[in-house]
Each structure stands twice: as structure tokens, then as C-alpha cells.
Amino acid sequence: MIRNVVVINDFAYINGGAGKVAIMSALALADQGINVFFFCGTGPVCEELKNSKVKIVSTNQGDITKGSKIKGLLQGINNKFAEEKLYQLLQQLDKKKTIVHCHAWSKILSSSIFKATKKANIPVVITGHDYGTVCPNGCFYDFRKNEICSCKPLGCKCIIKNCDKKRYIYKAFRIIRQF
């Protein structure tokens, strides 16, 4: 029986659909007597979480799109600090009674969180709130041609196609993050 759920989201407040679902699911699970940890990149922690039984674990890091571009690039590709902090948390929990529920990890955290879950041998559930895990644009759309993209996600044509609404370098960054 599951006793511990680690909910992962970049932010500890509602800033869109992913945040709303992550926070509301954490609260609902805690109300059912589940031991819930909310692992996030930054606050401020919303009042709903503050006034609940949910335990907050934050890396207290900034958004990768703010501040130094080099720091953001490195943090976005491999957020080693978040990986280590999550692994430390997971080591404290019974892996037979714990799951990790991921919502959003692209603005502060990174896919390095999955290295921590794999190393800790804890199962992961992902609620996809967009297509960012398979499409570098996050929406299967060619912004240059203003049409739906027909490329195989992350296939050769997809990778070389300049379809981003910004510059190709942004798409390349998002592709690198996937691997």
C-alpha cells in the first residue's frame, strides 16, 4: 500500500494548470492520510500548502529563464542540486510504499530528477500538462509556417527543422534537455 507520495512541480504556488493540478492533488492525497512531500524549485509557498499537512521540500532556486543565461543553461540541462536533494529525500522513505508524481520540471528543476528516482528505485507517475516531453516546441506546431507539425516527435526531421517561435538555439536547448 502506498503511504508516501512525492509530488514534483517547479513552483510551490499556482501559476497555471500544472501548478493547480499539482497542488490540488497534493492536498487531496494529504486529506486522505497519505504522507505527501511537495518537492519544488521555488516558492513562495501558497497558503493552501502552508495550511496543510503537506511537507514542502524546495531547492530554493530561480527560474532558468531569469538571470544568467549560462547558469540557466547549465541548470536547465542538468540540475545536479535538485537531483541530489530529491535523492536525499527519497532515501528517507520506504521505497516499497512510495511513488513520485511529476507535474512540471522545465522552468527550475530538470530531467535530472529522474536520475534520482531511478537511483532510489522508486516508481514515477507523470501527469503531462503539455507536449514538452516529446515535442521541443511543446505543441506540435511549426511557428515558421503557421501550421501543425507533421514530423515524428524528436525524429531526425524534427530535430533539424527550424520551427520554433524563437530562434533555433532555443529548440536545440530543449532537445538536449530531453536526453
Model-assigned labels for residue ranges:
Residues 2, 13-15, 28-80, 89:
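N-terminal strand-loop element at the rim of the active site
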Residues 8, 39-41, 127-128:
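Generic beta-sheet signal
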Residues 9-23:
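A short, glycine/small-residue-rich beta-strand->loop->alpha-helix junction that serves as a flexible
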Residues 19-20, 48-52, 69, 112-114, ...:
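Short aromatic-enriched loop/helix-cap "lid" or pocket-rim segments at secondary-structure transitions
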Residues 25, 29-30, 117:
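Hydrophobic alpha-helical packing residues
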Residues 32, 120-122:
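Helix C-cap/helix->beta junction micro-motif
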Residues 65-69, 126-179:
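Acceptor-binding helix/loop patch of EC 2.4 sugar-transfer enzymes
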Residues 89-109, 123-127:
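Short N-terminal targeting/anchoring amphipathic segment
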